[in-house]
Regions:
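Short hydrophobic-acidic sequence motifs that mark active-site Asp/Glu residues
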Residues: 4, 46-48, 119
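Vicinal oxygen chelate
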Residues: 4-13, 41, 60-140
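N-terminal beta-strand motif that seeds the catalytic metal site of vicinal oxygen chelate
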Residues: 1-16, 69-74, 126-140
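Core segments of cupin and vicinal oxygen chelate
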Residues: 9-56
Length: 140
């Protein structure tokens, strides 16, 4: 298996509302809720939105409703940009889990929850370089 991730699909309660939220963040969808799924190009990856019930059924699991132990991360080029993105999320209707602040491991980050409670960390890591396409270059 090649070492990469192609698609992350989030289970959502209201596909149209979730699409509207991500579009309010400035993202452009490539499909409509009438298709039953919404896709957003995210650099070399794709973010999908699909009904929680359908996603659970397709995955062969049960939708237990609680936090699934996954956090999505969006790395940026400066602490100022962390604060800007958290502000954009707030304006789009996100629940802010924590405003941008320094962490004990040297990163500046904040976090928000989308309408379905999916956690997004917005982070500036001074030890990682971001390419023009947003790809992370890991040290070593």
């Amino acid at each position: 298996m090649e070492q990469r991730v192609s698609l992350v699909t989030l289970g959502v309660a209201d596909l149209a509302a979730s699409r509207q939220f991500y579009e309010a963040l400035g993202w452009t969808s490539t499909s409509s809720p009438e298709d039953g799924v919404v896709f957003f190009r995210a650099g070399p990856m794709v973010l999908g939105l699909w009904s929680r019930a359908e996603l659970a059924r397709d995955s062969g699991t049960k939708d237990t409703g609680g936090w699934g132990g996954v956090t999505l991360a969006h790395n940026v080029r400066s602490p100022t940009e962390v604060d800007e993105v958290i502000g954009e999320a707030r304006a789009a209707g996100a629940t802010i889990a924590r405003d941008g602040a320094p962490t004990f491991w040297g990163v500046y980050s904040g976090a928000f929850l989308d309408p379905d409670g999916h956690t997004w960390e917005i982070a500036h890591n001074p030890h990682w370089t971001l390419g023009a396409d947003g790809a992370i270059t890991l040290p070593g």
